[in-house]
Amino acid sequence: MTRPVVLEQSRAIPVAPEEAFARTLPMPLPTLFRQWYGPIPPIRAIRDQTGEWERAGQSRTIVLKGGGTMRETLTSVDAPKSFGYTITGITGPMAPLIDHVEGAWIFTPQGTGTRVTWRWTLHRKSALTAPALPVFARLWRGYARQSLESLSDHLVG
């Protein structure tokens, strides 16, 4: 079995942790992830979600521009500190590389605001895909930086 790869990106945002958490968890993903970053596509739509995104155990299908999909399941909600999820059933360009992802958003008090950290623990398909992961990791960090900037604009604006 191959070891997972942990990717993480953070940004300080000048809002209280409670507000950052409360407004990030239910935020529509196509609003947050609306831009391409190199070959990483934006989110086009969400399907199969029932009600507000707020409870562990809820699932939804993420549809990417370009045709890929993935299934997201909310695994933990610890307001206002963090929420976690898994991504499975990946189709499209990431499918040959990634088996599943354990994701987390973490909200830590920092000064008068919040340090928001987005973490992905990647479980690759096989050891054969390992050489491609450093390239994907570099791209993901850029995508995460861009997404955290978008989140900051949403929370502050």
What residues fall within each predicted segment?
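Hydrophobic ligand-binding cavity/cleft-lining segments
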Residues: M1-E52
